[in-house]
């Protein structure tokens, strides 16, 4: 066992900190208290140091956008079809991506990673530990959300292949969800009569956890109109949704606050690369938290 001794402990549950020990066994926290070092094989002196739980990155592409990999290292954007809910982050994840080491060094111990924002519907995000060399052993949960995207990226990737406007992008998402709804209705009717089970549809099957509220839509949104469209569609189909990036969220902070929707805000370092970044503001997260 390992004991982290006399550190200032932040629990992430309470604002108050306290000085104490953390006893660890087989990589898991066994006990938090004082004078626990007598039970340990190894003692790490933490006097004067701040001790935090591992950080969780709720939205990234680590393991699928491989460090210094160039085009061949980019596994997170599928550009042959704008609707690919059947894709899984687990199948593209590279456990040897150097980004994982960088994440660990920054204190990140768990990540939600998955498809990028080229597609209207991109596939499932998964949760991974950042430690390990075998993908299946690193998986915390295989499906945590279904990626969808609004705004410039789907337009740019598919402008000559079916999506040239925000209106079309929204319509494509609606069409996929409605098709899956009809499929789900048939599946439910087949519970009492297996002969009525619909012909297998891989895309519809992948969207069933969304419609059943087992996982949320994970919506890539920057502009205020895209944020509003994402929430509109979630309401229409009665599904859960989280908002990612939310660059112009401060413009409708009151409405977003009333929505109760969870948001992952940022990043803030690329304000000049796209039109939809023009209102980027590091203060947005603080404004929304109020």
Pin down the residues of each PLM region.
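Histidine-rich, glycine-flanked metal-binding segment
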Residues: 9-52
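A general structural motif
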Residues: 198-200, 219-223, 244-247, 273-281
């Amino acid at each position: 066992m390992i004991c982290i001794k006399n550190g200032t402990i932040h629990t992430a549950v309470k604002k108050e900190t306290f000085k104490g020990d953390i006893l660890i066994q087989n990589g898991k926290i066994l006990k938090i208290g004082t004078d626990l070092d007598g039970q340990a094989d190894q003692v790490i002196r933490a006097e004067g140091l701040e001790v935090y739980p591992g950080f969780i990155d709720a939205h990234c592409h680590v393991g699928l956008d491989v460090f210094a990999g160039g085009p061949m290292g980019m596994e997170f954007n599928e550009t042959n079809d704008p609707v690919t809910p059947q894709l899984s982050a687990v199948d593209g994840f590279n456990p040897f991506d150097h980004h994982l080491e960088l994440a660990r060094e920054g204190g990140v111990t768990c990540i939600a990673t998955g498809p990028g924002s080229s597609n209207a519907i991109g596939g499932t995000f998964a949760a991974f530990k950042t430690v390990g060399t075998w993908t299946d052993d690193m998986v915390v949960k295989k499906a945590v959300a279904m990626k969808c995207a609004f705004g410039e990226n789907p337009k740019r990737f598919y402008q000559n292949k079916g999506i040239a406007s925000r209106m079309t992008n929204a319509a494509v998402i609606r069409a996929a969800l409605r098709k899956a709804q009809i499929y789900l209705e048939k599946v439910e009717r087949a519970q009492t009569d297996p002969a009525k089970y619909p012909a297998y549809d891989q895309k519809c099957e992948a969207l069933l956890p969304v419609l059943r509220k087992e996982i949320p839509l994970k919506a890539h949104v920057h502009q205020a109109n895209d944020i509003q469209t994402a929430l509109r569609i979630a309401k229409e189909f009665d599904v859960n949704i989280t908002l990612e990036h939310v660059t112009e969220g401060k413009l409708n902070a009151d409405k977003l606050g009333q929505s109760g929707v969870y948001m992952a805000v940022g990043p803030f370092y690329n304000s000049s690369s796209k039109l939809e970044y023009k209102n980027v503001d590091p203060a947005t997260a603080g404004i929304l938290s109020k």
